[in-house]
């Protein structure tokens, strides 16, 4: 796109389509400027019938507003949409006194968010004030909801394992809701793998990182019964994934050369 539009950064590029009345070539589908990614995608798509990673992703926790306003009526004036916004947004930590620096009771849970200079911090809140978003009571992997620029192969900004009773604000999304830490460690290794991030890069063309961008990343079995040995290193797991999806040497070399390593 920079060749046609000088000094302009168009994240998704520019697609030029031609029409030939004499040919029927079918729909474009998901467009990628890399031929290797298109061929990898064709090999992976049949496996998506078994699930994709976006199906086990969970957005931020939400407030139970009735409970919150019963104890903190002043919060209604500080919550957007005339006090109807239920999502725990990035600014909730600084605006609402229901969040505390220290645990105030055995029923309090920790919430991961961003403080000054976008530094990651945890604050406490009584559990009765928040809904269970589907993974609050279980292990999960927490990743930023916005990351990088959308370039193929970028690293994810410090994904981490969230223990049970840890939630998160709108700045993050959670992957998985599993009962054991070993399963969460397997998920963490998977999202660090070059293969998974290559598949993510097909749909992620901006910094935004919502669940739908992970729709082409095939779901895996993260238990000990998996066909992938999750006890191996991330690079060794990549080799297993390349074999599972039948990638050619050319396709493997493309991923290895275009996707940055994460350990």
Feature annotation, model-predicted:
Residues 250-263:
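Short, amphipathic C-terminal "tail helix"
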């Amino acid at each position: 796109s920079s060749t046609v539009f000088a000094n302009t950064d168009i994240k998704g590029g520019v697609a030029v389509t031609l029409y030939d009345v004499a040919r029927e070539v079918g729909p474009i589908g998901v467009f990628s400027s890399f031929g290797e990614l298109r061929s990898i995608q064709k090999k992976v798509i049949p496996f998506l019938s078994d699930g994709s990673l976006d199906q086990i992703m969970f957005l931020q926790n939400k407030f139970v507003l009735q409970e919150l306003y019963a104890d903190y009526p002043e919060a209604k004036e500080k919550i957007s949409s005339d006090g109807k916004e239920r999502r725990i947004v990035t600014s909730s930590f600084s605006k609402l006194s229901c969040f505390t620096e220290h645990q105030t009771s055995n029923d309090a849970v920790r919430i991961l968010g961003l403080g000054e200079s976008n530094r990651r911090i945890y604050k406490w809140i009584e559990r009765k004030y928040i809904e269970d978003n589907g993974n609050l009571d279980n292990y999960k992997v927490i990743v930023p909801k916005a990351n990088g620029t959308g370039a193929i192969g970028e690293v994810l900004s410090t994904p981490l394992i969230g223990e049970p009773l840890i939630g998160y604000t709108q700045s993050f999304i959670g992957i998985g809701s599993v009962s054991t830490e070993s399963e969460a460690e397997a998920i963490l290794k998977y999202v660090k793998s070059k293969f998974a991030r290559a598949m993510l890069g097909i749909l992620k063309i901006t910094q935004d990182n919502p669940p739908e961008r992970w729709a082409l990343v095939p779901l895996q079995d993260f238990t000990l019964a998996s066909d992938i040995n999750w006890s191996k290193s991330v690079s060794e797991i990549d080799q297993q994934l390349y074999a599972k999806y039948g990638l050619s040497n050319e396709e493997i070399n493309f991923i290895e050369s275009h996707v940055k390593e994460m350990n």
